[in-house]
Amino acid sequence: MIMDNFDSPFLYNRPEITVDSLKKSIVYKLIFSIGRSPKEASQRDWLNATLYAVRDFVTEGWITTARQSRSEETRRVYYLSMEFLIGRTLSNAMLAEGVYDVAKQALSELNVNLEDVLEKEVDPGLGNGGLGRLAACFMDSIATLALPGVGYGIRYEYGMFKQEIEDGHQVEKPDAWLDKGAAWEFIRPSKRHTVRFGGGIHFEGKKCIWTSKEEVEALAYDQMIPGYANDSAATLRLWSAYAGDRFDLADFNKGDYFAAVQDRTLSKNISRVLYPDDSTWSGRELRLRQEYFLVSASLQDIIYRHKRIHNTMENFADKVAIHLNDTHPALAIPELMVILIDQEGYEWKKAWDITRRVFSYTCHTLMSEALETWPVEMMAHILPRHLQMIFEINDYFLEYVRTYVSTDAEFIRRVSLIEEGDHRKVRMGWLSVVGSNKVNGVAAIHSELMVTSTFADFARIYPERFTNVTNGITPRRWIGVANPELSALFDRYIGKEWRRDLSQLTLLKDKVQDPELKKSIAQIKYNNKVKLANYIKNELGVEVDPNALFDVQVKRIHEYKRQILNVLHIIARYNAMLENPEKDWVPRVFILAGKAASAYYAAKQTINLINDVANIINHDERLQGRLKVVFIPNYSVSLAELIIPAADISEQISLAGTEASGTSNMKFALNGALTIGTLDGANVEILDNVGQDHIFIFGNTVEQVESLRRHGYRPFDYYQNDEELRKVVDQIISGRFSPTDANRYHQLLQSLQYHDYYQAFADFRSYVDMQQNVDAKYQDQNAWIDSTLQNIVNMSYFSSDRTILEYAEKIWKIKPVK
C-alpha cells in the first residue's frame, strides 16, 4: 500500500478487515507495543492491544482528513470546550470501522471474550455532565459528516472525581483514569505552547506591554474521533500542563529537593482536575487559570496552523471559525485581540473586526446566576493584559451603545461588561455576546427566552446576532453502542443507513402496528432491564424485578433539576402503598444517579436523602418488593449506556424555564422510554414530535413560574394546604428516614418550606397526579408499547448530525472536505 498524501510515496501494509489479519495484529501489538506474551496477558493487556490494532484502521483516514482540511480553500471550525465526555472508545471505534464482529471472532479464537475486554476500558475523565457529552456527540457528527473541525480541551489527569457512597454520603475520590494508560491517544511532543500568567502591564506610548511572572507549558495529546463508515476522523486535541524546563538545578544541588520541583508541581495542577472546588479564592483562581490555559494554548495552535497554510493573518476571519461552548472559553476573545494587537501589529478597530467575525457562542443556561463572572481583582492579578483589553472592549462597546442604541444610564449599567459594586466583576456571558458574530440557544423555548430575558438588552442592540440550534445526540453511540438489540431490529426493518441518516426511522411509521415489531420492542426492553437489574444486584446488592416499571432520573445533581421533587413523590407513593396495601399497585423501581459538585451542600444533602429513603423503603417487607429505590454511584457515559436502554420512564422534571435543552431526554425517548416532564428545554420539542398522548407533561409553564415569582411565591402555603405533601415533609424533618440523626435534613427542608426557589412544592400536586396516569398507561401494555414506538419513530429530528449541519450552514459557514 502507498500512502499518497505526501510529496513522495511511502510503502506500508494497511491492516485488512479479516479475522486472521486482526488476530495477528492484536497479538503483534500485545507483544511489541505492550511487551506481554499472550500467555501472561491480563484482560487489560488484551484491551490495550485491541485498541492499538483498531486504532490502525482509523489512523489513515484521520491523516487524510487532516490533510484535506489543510487545503488553502478550506474554512475550518475550532470547537473550544472545557469538557468532552467521550465515553469508552473501543466499542464506538469498532462499530464506526465495521470491525466489531471481526474483532469479536478474532479475540474468541485467541480464547478472549470481547465483552469482558470492553468492560476493562475506563471512561476518560474529561467531563461531567450534559455540556461535555454534547461536545462529544458534536465531534462524532463532525467526523461522520467529514466537516473540517478540531476540538480543543484539557487532558484532566484525575477527571472531576470518582463518586463513592459511604453511609449514604457522597465521597469524592481521585478518578485516576490515566493510570492504566490511554492507548487511543497520540502524544505530540512537538506541539507545545507557552502560556503566561501574572506580572504587570505598562504603556510605551499607546502600546501596552505585558511582563508576565509565570510560564506554563501546554503539551498536546490527540484523540481520534472516527466518522461512521466514511474513512474519516476528526481530531480532539487535549492540553496537559507542564513546567517546561523549570527545574531548578541550583536548588537541587544544594540539597533543597522540594524547592527544585515545586514550580513543576504547581504548574501541573492546572490540568489535574476538572472544575476544582470553587468555594475558596484559590479554587476560583485555579479555575480561571484552567480556562485561560485552554484558550491560550488553543489559539496559539490555531494561529500556527493558519500561518503554516496561508502565511498571513489577513484572511484569518475568512478561514477560521472558533466556537465557544458556554462561557468557559470566553477569554479567547480578549486573547485574540491581545495577539492581533501586541504580536501581529494590527490597529485596534481592525483587530476587533477580525475577532468578531471569528467567534460564535453557545449559551447553555437561562439562569443569569449561572453565567460566569470573575472578580476584577483576581483577573488583574492573573491576567492583567486581558483585563485591560476587556476594559478597552467595554469602552468601545458602550460608546457604540450610547451612539446608536440608548444613552439611558440604567441600560448602560445593565449591558456593561463590568458589573459595578463593592467587588467589581467581569461578566463573561456579556463578553461572549459582544465578541461573537452569532449567539445560539439550544432549544426553541430556550432561544426564545434567551432574547426575552437573559440577553434581552443585547437582543435590542444586536437583533440579528441571536439564533436557535436545537441540541441533538449521536445515534451511533446511543443506539449503536448502547442498544445493540434495538440496532439489529432497525437493521432488519429499515436497513443500516439510519446510523448516518436518522430520518430513516420515519420508515418505521408504517409498521408501528406490526405485532412482531411490538413483540420485539417489548422483548428488547425487557432484556435491557434484566441487564441493568443484574448490575444493580452485583454492584449494590439490591434485587429489583425487571417486570417492574423502571423510573429513571440520571443527571447532575442540582436544585434546578429537582431530584428533590422526585424524592418527595417516592415518599408519597411509599405512604400511599402502606395505607392501601390491597390496591393493585404497579411495581416500580426508582433509579437515580449523578454527581454533586464537591462544594454544593444542598446537592450533596439530596444524595444523602435519596440513599436514606432507599435504605428504609428497600428493607420494608410490607411492600413485598413492589417499590424499590436505587442510587447508582459514579454516573458515567458507560453507565448511561447501560441504564438508558432499560428505562421505562424518563424523569425530565426541571422547573420550566431553567433547563436550556437537556439531551438525556432525547436519549431516553430514542430508546423507547416515555418522558414525564415539564414544558422546559427540549421537552417542548419532544412533545411536538411525539404528540401529547405519548408523553406525560405536568407542572407550571414558564409564564406561570414567573407570575408566581412576581406575585410572591409562598411555598409554606402549599405545604399547609396539601395534606400529602405536608406528611412527606414532616416525615423527613422528624427523622423518619434518618433515625440516627433526626435533624439531618432540617436545613434542606426549611429551605423548601420558606424559599423553594425552584418551586418544587408548587409543582408537587401536578407531578403526583401525573404519576397516576403513568401507572394507568403501564397497566395497559399494548398502549404503553404503542407510545414507546411513537417515541422511537419520531426522534429523527434530535440527531446531532442535523444539529451540526445547522451549525455548519447558519453559524460556522463550513463545508465537508469529502
Swiss-Prot record:
GO terms for cellular component: cytoplasm. Its cofactor is pyridoxal 5'-phosphate. Coiled coil: none annotated. One of its GO terms (molecular function) is pyridoxal phosphate binding. The modification N6-(pyridoxal phosphate)lysine is found at residue 667. GO terms for biological process: glycogen catabolic process. InterPro entries: Glycg_phsphrylas, Glyco_trans_35, Pyridoxal_P_attach_site. Its EC number is 2.4.1.1. Phosphorylase is an important allosteric enzyme in carbohydrate metabolism. Enzymes from different sources differ in their regulatory mechanisms and in their natural substrates. However, all known phosphorylases share catalytic and structural properties. NCBIfam families: P_ylase (TIGR02093). Belongs to the glycogen phosphorylase family. This is Glycogen phosphorylase. It comes from Pasteurella multocida (strain Pm70).
